[in-house]
Amino acid sequence: MMCGFASNQSPKKLSSKKSSATNVHLEISPVKHHPPCKVYENVQGSCLDSAICTTVAKCADLTDDLPVHNKENLLHRLNDLETNSYEEYSALQDSGYSSILQNDSPCQDETDRKVSDIQVRETPKNFMSYQRPFHTLSKINLPILRFEEAVCSTLKKMRKTNKKIDWNAVDVVCGGNYGLEHLIGKSMGLERFDILAELFHRDFKHLLTKILRHLSAMDLINVISVSTTWRKLLQKDNWAYNAYKLGCKELCEKRAKVSSHTATRDESLCRVPLASVQKVAASSLCTSKKQSKNKNGGLSCNRLAEFIEVAQTLKNDQSLKVCVDCGSPAKHDPCLHRAICTRESCKLDFCTRCSCKYHFSKSCLMSKPGSYRIPSEPLPGSKKSKQNLRRL
């Protein structure tokens, strides 16, 4: 076997040019190459001797293990490599799995399986049992799907026993609590829809307060007269109910001021010839004072408004009286001493002298003597007669 170095060759025969070349490769970008010192050459020579001796010994050890480099040994080794690669490839083909990548191997497949098993084992059981599919969640959340499922299940059960469909069973299912009253769009297509009542039934107080804040006093008066539900929702809102009360008071005061110019004196028997000349009507203020004297309390604002409305429809020879039964305004004819109540549910026709049913030409049946007193004529020169003259 040929070797790179001979054992008899001395290291001193190496040229200085080669040593300087090796030193140049080790240095880092020198700017100027100075000539080496003599001491440095001696040290470098000793280092090279030791390095060459070690490399020669290592090469000798390696050459003992390696086979002889001839043609027969080389062909034998190539044949062994081809047989090994063919056996591995045939094993992969027989197993039914062959990958293009060279790094894939059955050992790697086993490690992948172990890792997947470890990952499955590490997942907690509570989490795996808690997970549900998406369609079950949607069925639970949507009331229409729950109702549909209940109807289909009942129809299936009935189909097994009877071929005919009994729609009464569907009505029974509809009576269940599925929350269908809260569905969006269930009131679509209706001509009229009470939004305030729906908000009140669903207890949306914050929305009702915002709506009522935008209404005036007259609007609140109209709201309270629509229905009982609107009255309740207005009474529950303190601010709106107080505004409604103030609006009612202001309205009554305005109507009283407007009707003050129509105030006239009370009718009397001796004033019959003048009935066709002047309009005789009872003053709203006078009637309220009389009612307060006769009864504890006075007429309410609504009752006062009724009297004012009826007074505007009176004829020249008519006046107002209070109904004996219901206290509503009654149109009085002083010539006949007859009064008829204007209330539709009452419509009492009574005599103003005896407060009984009107008896036409018959004499009055006095239940209590002295209960009815014919008003005397005013004395000439008295205060009342002077007022009558001024009015004429």
From Swiss-Prot:
<dbReference type="GO" id="GO:0007088">
    <property type="term" value="P:regulation of mitotic nuclear division"/>
</dbReference>
<dbReference type="GO" id="GO:0008270">
    <property type="term" value="F:zinc ion binding"/>
</dbReference>
<feature type="binding site">
    <location>
        <position position="341"/>
    </location>
    <ligand>
        <name>Zn(2+) 1</name>
    </ligand>
</feature>
<feature type="binding site">
    <location>
        <position position="351"/>
    </location>
    <ligand>
        <name>Zn(2+) 2</name>
    </ligand>
</feature>
<keyword id="KW-0498">Mitosis</keyword>
<comment type="pathway">
    <text>Protein modification; protein ubiquitination.</text>
</comment>
<keyword id="KW-0132">Cell division</keyword>
<dbReference type="GO" id="GO:0045835">
    <property type="term" value="P:negative regulation of meiotic nuclear division"/>
</dbReference>
<dbReference type="GO" id="GO:0016567">
    <property type="term" value="P:protein ubiquitination"/>
</dbReference>
<feature type="binding site">
    <location>
        <position position="354"/>
    </location>
    <ligand>
        <name>Zn(2+) 2</name>
    </ligand>
</feature>
<dbReference type="GO" id="GO:0005819">
    <property type="term" value="C:spindle"/>
</dbReference>
<keyword id="KW-0963">Cytoplasm</keyword>
<feature type="binding site">
    <location>
        <position position="326"/>
    </location>
    <ligand>
        <name>Zn(2+) 1</name>
    </ligand>
</feature>
<feature type="zinc finger region" description="ZBR-type">
    <location>
        <begin position="319"/>
        <end position="367"/>
    </location>
</feature>
<keyword id="KW-0539">Nucleus</keyword>
<dbReference type="GO" id="GO:0051726">
    <property type="term" value="P:regulation of cell cycle"/>
</dbReference>
<dbReference type="GO" id="GO:0005634">
    <property type="term" value="C:nucleus"/>
</dbReference>
<keyword id="KW-0479">Metal-binding</keyword>
<feature type="domain" description="F-box">
    <location>
        <begin position="197"/>
        <end position="244"/>
    </location>
</feature>
<keyword id="KW-0833">Ubl conjugation pathway</keyword>
<comment type="subunit">
    <text>Part of a SCF (SKP1-cullin-F-box) protein ligase complex. Interacts with btrc. Interacts with skp1. Interacts with cdc20. Interacts with pin1; stabilizes fbxo5 by preventing its association with btrc in an isomerization-dependent pathway; this interaction is present during G2 phase and prevents fbxo5 degradation. Interacts with plk1.</text>
</comment>
<feature type="compositionally biased region" description="Low complexity">
    <location>
        <begin position="7"/>
        <end position="20"/>
    </location>
</feature>
<dbReference type="GO" id="GO:0106061">
    <property type="term" value="P:negative regulation of exit from meiosis"/>
</dbReference>
<keyword id="KW-0863">Zinc-finger</keyword>
<feature type="binding site">
    <location>
        <position position="364"/>
    </location>
    <ligand>
        <name>Zn(2+) 2</name>
    </ligand>
</feature>
<feature type="binding site">
    <location>
        <position position="346"/>
    </location>
    <ligand>
        <name>Zn(2+) 1</name>
    </ligand>
</feature>
<comment type="function">
    <text>Regulates progression through early mitosis by inhibiting the anaphase promoting complex/cyclosome (APC). Binds to the APC activator cdc20 to prevent APC activation. Can also bind directly to the APC to inhibit substrate-binding. Required to arrest unfertilized eggs at metaphase of meiosis II, by preventing their release from metaphase of meiosis II, through inhibition of APC-dependent cyclin B destruction leading to stabilization of cyclin B-cdk1 complex activity.</text>
</comment>
<dbReference type="InterPro" id="IPR036047">
    <property type="entry name" value="F-box-like_dom_sf"/>
</dbReference>
<feature type="binding site">
    <location>
        <position position="359"/>
    </location>
    <ligand>
        <name>Zn(2+) 2</name>
    </ligand>
</feature>
<dbReference type="GO" id="GO:0005737">
    <property type="term" value="C:cytoplasm"/>
</dbReference>
<dbReference type="InterPro" id="IPR001810">
    <property type="entry name" value="F-box_dom"/>
</dbReference>
<dbReference type="InterPro" id="IPR047147">
    <property type="entry name" value="FBX5_43"/>
</dbReference>
<dbReference type="GO" id="GO:0045841">
    <property type="term" value="P:negative regulation of mitotic metaphase/anaphase transition"/>
</dbReference>
<dbReference type="GO" id="GO:1990948">
    <property type="term" value="F:ubiquitin ligase inhibitor activity"/>
</dbReference>
<keyword id="KW-0206">Cytoskeleton</keyword>
<protein>
    <recommendedName>
        <fullName>F-box only protein 5-A</fullName>
    </recommendedName>
</protein>
<dbReference type="GO" id="GO:1904667">
    <property type="term" value="P:negative regulation of ubiquitin protein ligase activity"/>
</dbReference>
<dbReference type="Pfam" id="PF00646">
    <property type="entry name" value="F-box"/>
</dbReference>
<dbReference type="GO" id="GO:0005813">
    <property type="term" value="C:centrosome"/>
</dbReference>
<keyword id="KW-0131">Cell cycle</keyword>
<dbReference type="GO" id="GO:0051301">
    <property type="term" value="P:cell division"/>
</dbReference>
<dbReference type="InterPro" id="IPR044064">
    <property type="entry name" value="ZF_ZBR"/>
</dbReference>
